[in-house]
Amino acid sequence: MSAKSRLIALLPALAVLLSACATMTPDECRQANWYDLGARDGMAGETLAKFTARRDACAEVKVVADANGYARGRDIGLRSFCRLENAAPLGARGGSYEGVCPPAIDYEFRRRFDVGYAVYRWHSEVDRIEERMRSHERKLRDADHDEEKAIKAAERDEDRRRIRRDFDEKRHRLREELHDFDRDLHRARDNLRDAEAAMYSLR
């Protein structure tokens, strides 16, 4: 197996080592293997803006980036990133696609990415609605305690009647909103199931 083939085989494992930062420290610049950096950035689907940021950071400490080595490594990384089977899972994780794949597969990669991203979007919507429902349910539970406390602090019957009326209206509003959330949740779950089915059909 050639060195290039071994690198391609190891790229999935290297993905976990991807740097979260675009810039580099002075020590990282001095010790950089630009071929490896290019391979890692390619595996992450980074645009050449990542190289520009690295190059500029290293220029500040008088280190010249190896543009050719980086480009060779990035090409290897992109070969792994641009596999069509990676597109939908990337979208489903909420990742981004910056159009870095070759024109011959860009359209299909983007289409599959969008199918996966629909899963992420609807999953996020389900989570958002469920959190709002939990918040409203907490408010409903707290309303009884808050009402009792406010009534005890009131000195006049008129004030107590107003407090009861206000809390009754609050509970009614919360229950109506919960009903709306429940309807929205069912619709979002249906859309999530459809999106998941569309993604699985790609396999």
Model-derived segments and spans:
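Sec-dependent bacterial lipoprotein signal peptides
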Residues: 1-21
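Intrinsic-disorder/low-complexity detector
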Residues: 21-203
